[in-house]
Amino acid sequence: MPKYLIADFIVEIEPKFDYLKKLCEPFLYEGERSADFSAIPSDSYLNSLLSRMVEGSTIDEAEEFATASIFNRKIIHRGAMLVHSSALVFDGKAYLFSADSGVGKSTHTKMWLKRFGSKAHILNDDKPVVKIKNEVPLCCGELRLTAEAELLTTKPFP
């Protein structure tokens, strides 16, 4: 079963549809660590979810949403959670800008990129994972990177 390194977790995922396959591809893990957990939705869960999604939604979208939901529930029990924010790395440290939708988190992040150039890069522009490891808060990217993301990394940043 394929394993992926996502937000510093080794996760078993079996993408069935192209959208999730493409999202997962850069995170493929071939190392020796065993999986921390699996995030594999059942067919019945996918079909149930799709029937409740906005008209016109695809099974590909349902699979990504279902897999992300499983992932999100499982990381909570491992000292991590998603934070609705825009996260960037500046001089090796993560900075998160969190607010209601439409306030300007991404705009603020882009201003940092413009101001600091190559010293800064986007880690995740929507829902980075924050976890505590050895009493240190760390920020990690996850599958849903934006087109503006300059760095695809599995490395956590303090």
Regions found by a protein language model. Give the residues of each.
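A noncatalytic interaction/capping subdomain that flanks phosphate/NTP-handling catalytic cores
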Residues: M1-S101, M111-L123, V129-P158
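Conserved lysine of the Walker
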Residues: K105
